[in-house]
UniProtKB/Swiss-Prot annotation:
Main EC class the enzyme belongs to: transferase
An example Gene Ontology biological process: AMP salvage
Cellular compartments annotated: Cytoplasm
GO cellular component, one term: cytoplasm
Lineage: Bacteria, Bacillati, Actinomycetota, Actinomycetes, Propionibacteriales
Organism: Cutibacterium acnes (strain DSM 16379 / KPA171202) (Propionibacterium acnes)
Protein name: Adenine phosphoribosyltransferase
GO molecular function, one term: adenine binding
Length: 177
């Protein structure tokens, strides 16, 4: 690994049995609290991202912390993908299954112009439910998904393979665990 990746990895804490038994939560709060670590994470995400991007979509809540700075670095807009009831006006919705439950994501129907090139940025790729739901929202918006960038890929959960089978990608991860 590189110095930046080593720094990032050292600032991610494993929390066993959270939010429920059998799940190991990747706690990024030490990373976010360390300015050098946070900057390294953003730099690594930007380095793996497509340069031909109009809009970066980030998912609530931890995806926001990475997608916004990545969008600024790429000279692109940032669009939040939120839980139901958090966005005023007309939205597209997509439900999905998580590693430990189910959820729904929404995006404003006018958030992205049709034909725009979209990059999805999130903190963790686990079972791919969140990314697949967001990719579906990109399709509903009439935009073009040009890539997915995540801070951490939990390879044992097979998210990348699910995205490959669904034709979603390319997928880039800063750390693969």
């Amino acid at each position: 690994m590189t110095y930046r990746k080593d720094l990032i990895a050292s600032l991610i804490r494993d929390v066993p049995d959270f939010p429920e038994p059998g799940v190991t939560f990747k706690d990024i709060t030490p990373l976010l609290a360390n300015p050098n670590g946070y900057a390294a994470a953003i730099s690594e995400l930007v380095d793996t991202a497509s340069r031909d991007v109009d809009v970066v979509l980030g998912m609530e809540a931890r995806g926001f912390m990475f997608a916004g700075p990545v969008a600024l670095s790429l000279g692109a807009g940032f669009v939040p993908v939120r839980k139901p009831g958090k966005l005023p006006g007309d939205v597209y919705s997509q439900s999905f299954v998580l590693e430990y439950g189910s959820a729904t994501l929404t995006v404003h129907q006018d958030a992205v112009q049709p034909g725009s090139k979209v990059l999805i940025v999130d903190d963790v790729l686990a079972t791919a439910g969140t990314v697949r739901a967001t990719a579906s929202l990109v399709e509903q918006l009439g935009a073009e998904l040009v890539g997915v960038s995540v801070l951490i890929e939990l390879s044992a959960l097979g998210g990348r393979e699910k995205l490959d089978r669904a034709g979603i990608g390319p997928v880039n991860a800063v750390l693969t665990i």
